[in-house]
Amino acid sequence: MASRFMTDPHAMRDMAGRFEVHAQTVEDEARRMWASAQNISGAGWSGMAEATSLDTMAQMNQAFRNIVNMLHGVRDGLVRDANNYEQQEQASQQILSS
């Protein structure tokens, strides 16, 4: 399978925007999940069962946070690379025109 490299800075920034939307969606859903877990806690749960449930939810919340951080990392990398590509392209054009 041939690799395709994205070299259009505008497309790279558009793709970065998509990663931001995905990150926001994951973050929103994780927040709702955590709120739901907090609402359930104490409603018939007690002792070890409640503690285990909250611990599991905390671990899942951290996993979602890690996903959000990775999505933000990809977003930031795309924006950075788009900026670098444009700068290098401009420098190359200046060299060729002189």
From Swiss-Prot:
Pfam families: WXG100. It comes from the Bacteria. Disruption phenotype: EsxKL deletion mutant shows reduced intracellular growth in primary human macrophages. Also shows growth defects in the absence of host cells. Induction: Differentially expressed under different growth conditions. Highly expressed in sputum bacteria. The keyword Secreted applies. It is found in: Secreted. InterPro entries: ESAT-6-like_sf (IPR036689), T7SS_ESAT-6-like (IPR010310). Transmembrane segments: none annotated. Belongs to the WXG100 family. CFP-10 subfamily. Strongly interacts with EsxL to form a heterodimeric complex under reducing conditions. The complex is regulated by the redox state of EsxL. This is ESAT-6-like protein EsxK. It comes from Mycobacterium tuberculosis (strain ATCC 25618 / H37Rv). The gene is esxK.
